[in-house]
């Protein structure tokens, strides 16, 4: 048996996999997040490739421009430089108290990363010699609530709604999509970083990283939770204020500005609490006769025009069919595009990234249609996209019963997702229920 562990990972699957494994093994351990890659020339970052690819397919740019983007989007090692699933889960590791304070999402090329890795090893040895320092001792329901409030502040990936409940399950704690929805409703959204914001992810660290976010929202956090430092969250934050951490981050931001000829300030990246980008979090869980068990939307990355919309259903049974229709202009303004049979039991729940980017990068479609799926999305996805529609089609969920021309109502503020009409004609909820029952029998 091992006495302790150090878990190193960076990306979409590795980081949540490590956190689930760490919770299951339940020995004293410290997580070392692998950091973020640098942005390329013109602040190019990887999630923009979907946009470039869609523009190329539509004939809006030539192959030379596409090749330029492909060759420059990943100039270093590290997680993709936007708040996608990899970045979100690195941040969650620190927010849960399982990584050293200030260690999440630093540039992977920074010499500080090696220093944090060495310190993590030393701390893991200390934890192994102490009592009551296993993950199950440190991570409580309050720790998860802290992490979810940080998730709201950063406009984190919707895939977090899959990973965080799985980690909590290993620790005997129940966290659901409703937990996210409840905490997000009145939470501040502060981080102006891609894909929902303006700047590449390395800027997050230069603005003070997770500790800076926590300082802004600390009145809503449980500051007495324990962490892998052997101290409480509140003690960690106080220590960082005193040891020059934020001054060091400011120095890195100055170098970034020098590199790109910009004059970005900390407040441009992480907004002050009273000047938040949004005051209702960043995700919403929608329910209705189309998703009785819920569906999720990142509303901070969705055009305001689509917060309430009535659209015509255009169902597809695979992403390939749908993407082809979007790129060939067979999808029109006012359509609700469905991709179904892409849930966990269907095709293993792959990401619908290229279809979502083809829609959001289209000036006309990006603000006039929606994409609804029982699959999931890349953390890079933007636009009017709704995923995790449950029950999934393979399980006989209502998404499997949608037909061409059904009227679909999306209401983000009211958290509703409903079929409200058939063949373009509005019907009562009772009539809709009867028609869906008949379709199910057929």
Where are these regions (language model features)?
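A short, small-residue-rich loop immediately preceding and capping a beta-strand
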Residues: 1-18, 30-33
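Catalytic or ion-coupling anion/metal-binding cores of large enzyme and transporter domains
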Residues: 15, 21-27, 34-368, 372-392, ...
